[in-house]
Swiss-Prot record:
The lineage of its organism: Eukaryota, Metazoa, Chordata, Craniata, Vertebrata. Pfam families: HLH. Coiled coil: none annotated. GO terms for cellular component: RNA polymerase II transcription regulator complex. Transcriptional repressor. Binds with MAX to form a sequence-specific DNA-binding protein complex which recognizes the core sequence 5'-CAC[GA]TG-3'. Antagonizes MYC transcriptional activity by competing for MAX and suppresses MYC dependent cell transformation. This is Max dimerization protein 3. GO terms for molecular function: DNA-binding transcription factor activity, RNA polymerase II-specific; protein dimerization activity; RNA polymerase II cis-regulatory region sequence-specific DNA binding.
Length: 206
């Protein structure tokens, strides 16, 4: 933006100079030399005498160059007017007023750019802070998830050991009942055998 502002400043100076020259031409007086003291009047150097044909040719070339320069300046001013905000009325404008308005518009754009840059820095700082908070929360969630998995693993291990103990107790009960049942059956069969032998021996004796 700075080169544009400097260019506008140069155009402002040129426009002021042109308008001053036009006013001087309208009123028919010469301006003071800008580089001399206020009391001195500019004196134009006398041009060397030239042939009429060469003078007319040089004047024609000068006029053509001046026309081209003015046409180019007019196109540039028209493009500049189109770049101005729509709310500003430049339907009837002078070169100086248009350039001043353009300079004010550029200054306003520079202020808006600075505000946008400050807002951008603020948002970047806020984003970094939120990113750090997110990483901290993810770390806490990871720790809690590991603790939950560890607790579930311990609970499942406890249930497995309880089931194993219960199965062992049931197995011991079944073994005891099997052992006791076998002893009872043996005693019953042994008693039945003795009675049978007693009856057989009694019959023999008789």
């Amino acid at each position: 933006m700075e080169p544009v502002a400097s260019n506008i400043q140069v155009l402002l100076q040129a426009a002021e100079f042109l308008e001053r020259r036009e006013r001087e031409a309208e009123h028919g007086y010469a301006s003071l030399c800008p580089h001399h003291s206020p009391g001195t009047v500019c004196r134009r150097r006398k041009a060397p005498l030239q042939a009429p044909g060469a003078l007319n040719s040089g004047r024609h070339v000068h006029n053509e160059l001046e026309k081209r320069r003015r046409a180019q300046l007019k196109r540039c001013l028209e493009q500049l007017r189109q770049q101005m905000p729509l709310g500003v009325d430049h339907t009837r404008y002078t070169t100086l007023s248009l350039l001043r308005g353009a300079r004010m518009h550029i200054q306003k754009l520079e202020e808006q750019e600075q505000q946008a840059q400050r807002l951008k820095e603020k948002l970047r700082s806020r984003q970094q802070s939120l990113q750090q908070q997110l990483e901290q929360l993810q770390g806490l969630l990871g720790v809690r998830e590991r603790d939950r998995l560890r607790a579930d693993s311990l609970d499942s291990s406890g249930l497995s050991s309880e089931r194993f103990d219960s199965d062992q107790e049931d197995l011991e009960v079944d073994v005891e009942s099997l052992v006791f049942g076998t002893e009872t059956e043996l005693l019953q069969s042994f008693s039945a055998g003795q009675e049978h032998s007693y009856s057989h021996s009694t019959g023999t004796w008789l």
